[in-house]
Amino acid sequence: MNFEGKLLGQDLKIGIVVSRFNDFITGRLLDGAKDVLVRHEVESEKIDVAFVPGAFEIPLAAKKLAETGKYDAVITLGCVIRGATSHYDYVCNEVAKGVSKVSDTTGLPVIFGVLTTETIEQAVERAGTKAGNKGAEAAMAAIEMANLLKSI
């Protein structure tokens, strides 16, 4: 038997956690995610957004949303751009581990849509220009995974 997640958002409720840090990028990621969700028939009233100060706070907010039992998937959006110190490496690693852990412990699809880039230019490219919109891609993954888990 094959299981496959359909790309129809009808009847899905989606939570989104967005970092305010680098909001000139994360705002574009959020717009891309919401656009894809609505285009795939997720009702706008069934999309909830939680804003957090920075990427490091994303896993905790994602966990709280997941634990409510209200959502079929949670999308995490943020942008970490390398600076002159090792702070970037710690933040990227901890956010990725934290988001993965939330998904593993709750059994809910928690989609990693956090950009980890070397430069501002790379972030801009991934937020709706040359390299597409990673927020939109995260929304597609959320719809597919939510439906896949419903079919298993």
From Swiss-Prot:
Keywords: Riboflavin biosynthesis, Transferase. GO terms for biological process: riboflavin biosynthetic process. GO terms for cellular component: cytosol; riboflavin synthase complex. The active site is at H87. Pathway: Cofactor biosynthesis; riboflavin biosynthesis; riboflavin from 2-hydroxy-3-oxobutyl phosphate and 5-amino-6-(D-ribitylamino)uracil: step 1/2. Its EC number is 2.5.1.78. GO terms for molecular function: 6,7-dimethyl-8-ribityllumazine synthase activity. The keyword Transferase applies. 5-amino-6-(D-ribitylamino)uracil binds at F21, A55, F56, E57, C79, V80, I81, F112. (2S)-2-hydroxy-3-oxobutyl phosphate binds at A84, T85, R126. It catalyses: (2S)-2-hydroxy-3-oxobutyl phosphate + 5-amino-6-(D-ribitylamino)uracil = 6,7-dimethyl-8-(1-D-ribityl)lumazine + phosphate + 2 H2O + H(+). Belongs to the DMRL synthase family. PANTHER family: 6,7-DIMETHYL-8-RIBITYLLUMAZINE SYNTHASE, 6,7-DIMETHYL-8-RIBITYLLUMAZINE SYNTHASE DMRL SYNTHASE LUMAZINE SYNTHASE. Catalyzes the formation of 6,7-dimethyl-8-ribityllumazine by condensation of 5-amino-6-(D-ribitylamino)uracil with 3,4-dihydroxy-2-butanone 4-phosphate. This is the penultimate step in the biosynthesis of riboflavin. This is 6,7-dimethyl-8-ribityllumazine synthase. The gene is ribH.
